[in-house]
Amino acid sequence: MLVYNKDNAKEILENKVVFVDFWAPWCGPCRALGPIFEDLSEKYSESAVFAKCNVDDDERFARKHGIASIPCIICFVNGEETDRSLGFLPQEEIELFIQRNI
């Protein structure tokens, strides 16, 4: 799992399809989503790149992406945001979100 931050954002977004999980360690729903995102990143590793961004590590960078609440998964295609999923969702719904964006 890649770490997404201001230092490597351009490099990561050069991939065709990228899913970034914006999270924080103190966020209960984020901690619940973490293992689901990890499992799905392994399942769909051939189709997309998966990364995580701890919003506490760089709040300004998170705000640049319009992150107002977490967890939030953003899908980027060719460097442009195309979709986002906000809040905790069950694995089936996160998987549908991924499938419709790859």
What are these regions (language model features)?
Residues 13-23:
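Short active-site neighborhood of thiol/selenol oxidoreductases, capturing the structured segment around
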Residues 9, 22-23, 50, 76:
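Conserved hydrophobic/aromatic "anchor" residues
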Residues 75-102:
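Non-catalytic, surface beta->alpha helical segment in thiol-disulfide oxidoreductase systems
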